[in-house]
Amino acid sequence: MTGNVTGGMTVVRISDDALALACGADEVAEAFVAAGCTVERVSSWGMHWLEPLAEIDGQGFGPLEPGDVSAVLAGTSPKAIGAIEAHPFIARQQRFTFARAGKTRPLSLEDYAEYGGWQGLAKAREVGPEATIAQVTESGLRGRGGA
């Protein structure tokens, strides 16, 4: 089950990256929908050992199986990890590139636009190719592989 499903008032965010899917995120998402929840598929927080990881109102739960959903919704889950932003793995990080990880839908152009994703392209088109190349060269920006 990829994509968002509107069901109920409780909004559950679950990653839809390849690792989460391999760990059973679709089945967990379907269990939340069956329980009357709205599921939003988002990018991963990067805490892969907790996948499938669900987030409800900033609180994390994982790794989950479909049978864990009722305990999560009842507030009795032993798989509660507390506030995701306060988790030691996340709290010690300064996330620049991944600042919106776990909050946006990775394939959503609407989410991309909402967070200013087209601003760089608009600026590059405004100043033209030569000025864009000059700015990149001057900045020293390099590819992830060092190119």
Positions of predicted regions on the chain:
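Feature of Fe-S/electron-transfer and energy-metabolism proteins
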Residues: M1-A147
